[in-house]
Amino acid sequence: MAIENIYIARHGYRSNWLPKGPYPPPPTGIDNDVPLSEHGVEQAHELANYISKLDVKPEMIFSSPFYRCLETSKPTVEALKIPLYVDRGVGEWYKPDRPIIPEPATHEVMSKFFPSMISPDWEPSIIPSNKGETEEDIFERCHKFWPVFIDRVERKFPNVKTIMIVTHAATKSALGMNLLKFSSAKEPIDNKGTFIRNGSCAIDKFELVKGENESIPFEEREWKLTMNGNTSFLTNGEEMNWTFMNAFEAGSDADIKARRAAESGKLKME
């Protein structure tokens, strides 16, 4: 049986995005492995509540190994009582010129923070370079990820039709654009100049075009985007949207500084 529905969500609002703190240290001690803010935790619960009311619900979640993604996944895992697997293939994007390229915590470490939540029997579909990635590299990573990942899911869980991935803005965008068979994450998805939306806790849905099945190689299957960066269920709507048109890594200190400077300039003009 082929996977027919794929939800892809971004993690919730990070604690280091708050204008005045508090800024708790990374629970794992790993650089940039920050937790969600209280607001982000609330978003994660709103996401879980939204998903639990959908007609087509995910049957399992595959998460980035970074703390904020597991924290975002937790309410949905608990609400739907579905298994959670960690896959480094959907991990964060770090540029090569970054001083430190964070290595995510091991399963043993993360299980201490999320006891009995993370299923141990899943190996990464692909491992991001420990030297960082260019925009072209992360797009290629996601391109290589899909056929390996889907083949393993369909073999290991032959009765599963719907899955969910919880990841980061850049990875979410690159994953989606690869499903839609674009050659770059910077291309609009239609002639109106629309891009995949990547706000905090935003969720996309990709549906397999009818008539496709597991007998067709994954690379030849066609997908359609039926939900683009949906945040209608969030109290504050869309926040912290990011695309590859931004100059900085999503959610990085440089990104936050640039956003605040732009907002300050806007307020002065008003």
Swiss-Prot record:
SUPFAM superfamilies: Phosphoglycerate mutase-like (SSF53254). This is Uncharacterized protein YNL108C. It comes from Saccharomyces cerevisiae (strain ATCC 204508 / S288c) (Baker's yeast). Present with 1950 molecules/cell in log phase SD medium. GO terms for cellular component: cytoplasm; nucleus. One of its GO terms (molecular function) is phosphatase activity. InterPro entries: His_Pase_superF_clade-1, His_PPase_superfam, Phosphatase_SH3-domain, Tfc7/tau55. The lineage of its organism: Eukaryota, Fungi, Dikarya, Ascomycota, Saccharomycotina. It comes from the Eukaryota. To yeast YOR110w.
